């Protein structure tokens, strides 16, 4: 990324950087051209030294005072010049985590020339001052919101610039060729080519492959970020709610021998192997005249459409091989993983394994996974969890490959791919350099919107408004 010139904003902002509410420590952050001067007016160091004269990246013990009245004893950490998160002078007060203290310190900063920070304004300044690319800034929000090992690793990799460097490398190579083609336009009367066309074709092929790979990774990245949706489906009274309770190890769903008890979907998140799974207990699927139950059945079918994994419960008493195979084939969706769960096997003789073999043979090409469980007795629930964890690991080599998790990035990559395909078509049609340059510039534009090389205030406002105030 081309570093932008450091922007010392005319105003200095302040906000609580840690979570709100009572706690042991609260960090209050000042950032802006006058941050250190404002801090020096309200902070009295026990060393008697002025913060203005202190070196950058130093910590000072002292008191925060208003009209000679001590508000709190705290630590003041100072960052001078551009050597801070925001790329401008920053002071962070580590105070005791009283709501009253936090309120008084912020009021004191406001009274001495600061203003309240807007949502995400610290990170926005980091972007504007060239400390972060735009997609890295978005990854900061994802990192804060991450609730599993997988989502944490993906966000961390992007925040540290993995995705940024990949996009910038593509953009730079394309920019180099664009410059040569633009140069050709200046010598159009001399009919010379500065850009090697065969080399350019190879570059286009590389860019297309990379863009396609990144676009395809979004389906994986989205579930890693938001949790893998797992629909628990089957006939009424198949044991779906019992399975959800067994997976969670708590009584989350109502369990009853009365068929049709579950009328609506119940969703709970469980972390298995560092990955979030969103288990969805659905209404039993059957033909019914009950209007409310029918709505539940429709919702169940909608969840199947959106799920990455479908756990289909059955038992050998209430289901035939034909019924099971028909259900899977009618609800089959390319890309989803279907897992057959032969439930209530504590009540079934071992001979029913032939029943299972017949099902798998009938569903060859649709699924090859069948587990025998007893949700009520907890049999093979651990094996089911292990299977799901192993399946999730096959989705992506987390932490190794770049995974797209942001819909904005996905759309920009898709637009860039369309533009680069137009360049490729133009090459095949032997179009002139000026026409090729139009589509090349469009590709560069879309790639630039990802890292923030190309941006506008409306887009920035939308992105940073999703942040918490102190970040």
What are these regions (language model features)?
Residues 60-80, 260-288:
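Switch I (G2) and immediately adjacent beta-strands of P-loop GTPase domains
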Residues 115, 276-278, 369:
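Conserved beta-strand segments of alpha/beta enzyme cores
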Residues 1-153, 157, 161, 332, ...:
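A glycine-rich (often HGG/GG-containing) alpha/beta subdomain
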Residues 97, 247, 282, 314-317, ...:
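Glycine-rich, N-terminal phosphate-binding loop of Rossmann-like dinucleotide-binding domains
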Residues 279, 313, 341:
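Generic enzyme active-site microenvironment
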